[in-house]
Amino acid sequence: MRAELNQGLIDFLKASPTPFHATASLARRLEAAGYRRLDERDAWHTEAGGRYYVTRNDSSLIAIRLGRRSPLESGFRLVGAHTDSPCLRVKPNPEIARNGFLQLGVEVYGGALFAPWFDRDLSLAGRVTFRANGKLESRLVDFRKAIAVIPNLAIHLNRAANEGWPINAQNELPPIIAQLAPGEAADFRLLLDEQLLREHGITADVVLDYELSFYDTQSAAVIGLNDEFIAGARLDNLLSCHAGLEALLNAEGDENCILVCTDHEEVGSCSHCGADGPFLEQVLRRLLPEGDAFSRAIQRSLLVSADNAHGVHPNYADRHDANHGPALNGGPVIKINSNQRYATNSETAGFFRHLCQDSEVPVQSFVTRSDMGCGSTIGPITASQVGVRTVDIGLPTFAMHSIRELAGSHDLAHLVKVLGAFYASSELP
């Protein structure tokens, strides 16, 4: 069970270098399990016991498993996660020709750790919009092979490199993708033309625009002397997306279950497909009668907001409160912040702790040091947007926002088990 779940996560990470690809991967799994796609532009005809999913912007997804009881009686059991991760995104006019090399200008998306991006075998993926035969179309592309690198400057030329050398994103992060012959010009859009033909058999009249991100081609892996860890890119937060999907597809019971995987969390969630937009509320309203049905159903509902937590790093243990240091493989972490950076309260935390105990899953607590600031999640955003009671949780992780993060290999099974128990729970607090 644990090995199978971990391998499934590794496969999901490999297939999901961008939020667009992650959403497509989730949709494929749902369709294989009998879920039917709903188009927001059409009238919906849903029924008790139905299985559905909705996407928006190709980068956010809501999966719906309706029970036999009306949400007005039993509410919704919601699990929330996000599909995006910090990365380097290609600029609109990216070509940089310097000293015989072709580089691409990049914009930093989210709060990325810069240093780990150096000396990696990078590829490129995302969404391309183009015109073909006079028709406007979009397709996902993934170069898959390593096409770029950001080489470090040798220590001989930068003696202060190990003394906290600041990295300038504008000047030092553009990846090298090719050498140029003297006088040779480069057009990045021609490369995208070739990729569309190679990957989709489409000859584009013109590439109009794109949303493309570099990513590390090194596959995720189970590592450690005793296989204790999972190392890989985008664990924050595709790990939670994968856990939520596994729990949804395998949960027992007959409740109204929702999985929400939204884009743009790393940049504030303020978009038409992000948690700070209307996506979730609009979908839920379409599952309910008009009038006060939404307010009544949402007050019977609960959201588990799942986003990775900071595990105690042995080299930096003093960065944690001494009594609230989550351990890798120690189970899910309940995140608490009195200033509402997390939406957890005593009632929702107590309920989640109860689920863990009933499921024989270890559970931990996280509170940031009182002299340090605290990050946030989609939990408070969704709670304030929709009015749903929320508990913020996540699996402990090292190197969050690095190009390669680290989590415990036992924890995915822990999270899937307790989320399955949540989806199956007949009573909410």
From Swiss-Prot:
Q: Name one GO molecular function term.
A: aminopeptidase activity
Report the cofactors: Zn(2+)
Q: State the GO CC annotations.
A: cytoplasm
Give the record's GO biological process terms: proteolysis
The answer to whether keyword Metal-binding applies is yes
UniProt-listed InterPro entries = M18_aminopeptidase_2 (IPR022984), Peptidase_M18 (IPR001948), Peptidase_M18_dom2 (IPR023358)
Name the residues that span the membrane: none
What CDD domains would the database entry show? M18 (cd05639)
What enzyme class is recorded for this protein? hydrolase
Q: Which UniProt keywords apply?
A: Aminopeptidase, Hydrolase, Metal-binding, Metalloprotease, Protease, Zinc
Provide the E.C. number(s) assigned to this enzyme. 3.4.11.-
Binding positions (Zn(2+)): H82, H156, H401
A Pfam match: Peptidase_M18
Which NCBIfam families does the protein's record reference? Answer: PRK02813.1
Assigned protein family? Belongs to the peptidase M18 family.
Name this polypeptide is given: Probable M18 family aminopeptidase 2
The species is: Pseudomonas paraeruginosa (strain DSM 24068 / PA7)
